Amino acid sequence: MLQTAKFSLRALKHSIPHLGNCMQKQSYRNVAGPYYSRVRLKKYHLTKCLQNKPRIAGLARNIPSRSFSCKDLLPIKPESEKPISENMDAFEKVRTRLETQPQEEYEVVNAEIKHGGFVYYQEGCCLVRSKDEEADSDNYEVLFNLEELKLDQPFIDCIRVAPDEKYVAAKIRTEDSETSTLVVVKLSDQPVMEASFPNVSSFEWVKDEEDEDVLFYTFQRNLRCHDVYRATFGDNKRNERFYTEKDPSYFVFLYLTKDSRFLTLNIMNKTTSEVWLIDGLSPWDPPVLIQKRIHGMLYYVEHRDDELYILTNVGEPTEFKLMRTAADAPAIMNWDLFFTMKRNTKVVDLDMFKDHCVLFLKHSNLLYVNVIGLADDSVRSLKLPPWACGFIMDTNSDPKNCPFQLCSPIRPPKYYTYKFAEGKLFEETGHEDPITKTSRVLRIEAKSKDGKLVPMTVFHKTDSEDLQRKPLLVHVYGAYGMDLKMNFRPEKRVLVDDGWILAYCHVRGGGELGLQWHADGRLTKKLNGLADLVACIKTLHSQGFSQPSLTTLSAFSAGGVLVGALCNSKPELLRAVTLEAPFLDVLNTMLDTTLPLTLEELEEWGNPSSDEKHKNYIKRYCPCQNIKPQHYPSVHITAYENDERVPLKGIVNYTEKLKEAVAEHTKGAGEGYQPPNIILDIQPGGNHVIEDSHKKITTQMKFLYEELGLDSTDAFEALKKYLKF
């Protein structure tokens, strides 16, 4: 996915809690005129992080009942068991190399911005620029040394160049924190830092009537963005508050339309939005309200040729539709319906060109691109290859072409370009990935308890025999209207090559089938997502994909709610579970209004403090509230000490309760009963949006292989090749 957000619908994801690694990292984009964005892989060392110590006493310790923490990476085995199998040697070799060698991210971390004849990017620990034709050489100009901020392993998250190239602004953060510092550098023969602002989320440049650069930015406090500031530099330096949102359940986000004509001030929560237009040519004029907030109404705005294009769910059906109106008549009564989506359609992104509007869609779990001719309102719908599971958006200022990439969990991104003049989609030529012949992707459905058909995406080797005897790794999320993360991951490729079946369950609460799909899995319909997950796993087994003793389940963040609920209600369906930064204590979290995100989360989980119905409903599925003495699958939890979004206290509380339940059940289970491993791995440092480290990947893979009693030698040797040792 991306590397840049083309539309505020996508850019919004930076501010929604619990997203983190549910999606690929994105950079905000500025493509006015000659802008475009590229990315580089970011190199870093893991050794510093490994030397850190947890700052919360008592958390990094062995938890009885055969478990370990970050200090003990191997589970405790009773003396009666066999020694650790020889296949662990491969894992240990990989882990040793990981701890001593520089690593490359597979996720995008740093954005590049082209403005005029220069490309701005990060090189080493510096913000630099080089001439466009020399962008891939070592001939660059250093603009700012990030080490001046005295941060631990800082990197540039986003870059914006002022319209006349007098200034460049860069948002800088570290792997261990979501807090960002915005640095403004004055461009000259001797570049100097003009100003710095702490705790910045989104930011954009505009130019006023006197050609003065004006910077707008949002200030983040305790993960909440409620304040917008406006700043100028040079002789007329000033920094003033422009807007403050009073409702704590909303947040603010800035988005510059693609043509830079308007800066949009977006005020929103999970279900409702309000947009104000700031004139990109007269930023000192009062902003213009498009439509005041109405509960349940979402809308996002683009601009082209004095017309506003509005993506909104207003009207029936309550799915997204595209409307337009004159820029000088933005009120809702002037909106005209322009394009309607089909049922079961998710709008992934929108991009506006001179003569075309391009919609990136997911319909019935398959990817499409719709190209709308703005001169004649013609629509060309292109069904994309069935192997594709996700888009990676490329910002582009060329009005003649629309480039993008397609990817899947087991296939690296591949470039495609739609050329408007030819009216055709062109595929990148070159070496064909062998995975296309050695694996299969299937789209199947499971019938949930209420009859609703739930889509699944399944991957397995083409030549696999007797799939019922193959290991299965199931993935689920089901919250916030977000899709399952299905970008390319080398470890997923390795698993399929090693005979595993991968299944992605697109349950209600997620967004794969549109807004209603999300609505049917939130608040007092959360149990629909659990019923969907149960139906998916049972359907996989009934159709010959693996069996319970070889079935594992993986989830991140809010996906932990459904996984934890499944472990409590249907533990017999699983053998092992891996959870990362999981949300497990829903009730106590939502009761604690002192937590920074509780008020923003009310639209997703409900308000147990004031609504007894919500409270009782949460009690029915909350993982932490429903633990009981019974057999559980083995559980590996990765938590981060500095996670600001999912409190570590809730994860530890869940682990302790689960440990006690397992111990009580084991006492009465009889001789020979094999209790599960309950593993809590607390990573020093880190935060909710921490990047995927190779150490974490190999640790989790080792856990799955060990729990299923499989030989991991070939898998880890293959993984070493992908990690480029």
Swiss-Prot record:
Coiled-coil regions listed: none
Key word Repeat present: no
Key words of the record: Cytoplasm, Cytoskeleton, Golgi apparatus, Hydrolase, Nucleus, Phosphoprotein, Protease, Serine protease
Gene Ontology CC: one annotated term: Golgi apparatus
Tissue-specificity statement: Highly expressed in the brain, specifically in neurons of the neocortex, substantia nigra, locus coeruleus, and cerebellum, and a slightly lesser extent in neurons in the hypothalamus and hippocampus (at protein level). Also expressed in interneurons in the stratum lacunosum moleculare and stratum radiatum.
Entry EC no(s): 3.4.21.-
Location of the active site: S557, D643, H688
Pfam families: Peptidase_S9 (PF00326), Peptidase_S9_N (PF02897)
Phosphoserine: modified positions: S137
GO molecular function: peptidase activity; serine-type endopeptidase activity
InterPro entries found in the cross-reference section: AB_hydrolase_fold (IPR029058), Pept_S9A_N (IPR023302), Peptidase_S9_cat (IPR001375), Peptidase_S9A (IPR002470), Serine_Peptidase_S9A (IPR051543)
Deleted gene: phenotype: PREPL-null mice are significantly shorter and lighter than their wild-type littermates and suffer from neonatal hypotonia.
Predominant location: cytoplasm
GO BP terms, alphabetized: Golgi to plasma membrane protein transport; proteolysis; regulation of synaptic vesicle exocytosis; retrograde transport, endosome to Golgi
Cytoplasm in keyword set: yes
Cellular localization per UniProt: Cytoplasm, Cytosol; Golgi apparatus, trans-Golgi network; Cytoplasm, Cytoskeleton; Golgi apparatus
Top EC class of this enzyme: hydrolase
Control of this protein's activity: Inhibited by 1-isobutyl-3-oxo-3,5,6,7-tetrahydro-2H-cyclopenta[c]pyridine-4-carbonitrile.
Assembly mode: Homodimer. Interacts with the AP-1 complex.
Family, per entry: Belongs to the peptidase S9A family.
Function noted in UniProt: Serine peptidase whose precise substrate specificity remains unclear. Does not cleave peptides after a arginine or lysine residue. Regulates trans-Golgi network morphology and sorting by regulating the membrane binding of the AP-1 complex. May play a role in the regulation of synaptic vesicle exocytosis.
Name of protein: Prolyl endopeptidase-like
Species lineage: Eukaryota, Metazoa, Chordata, Craniata, Vertebrata
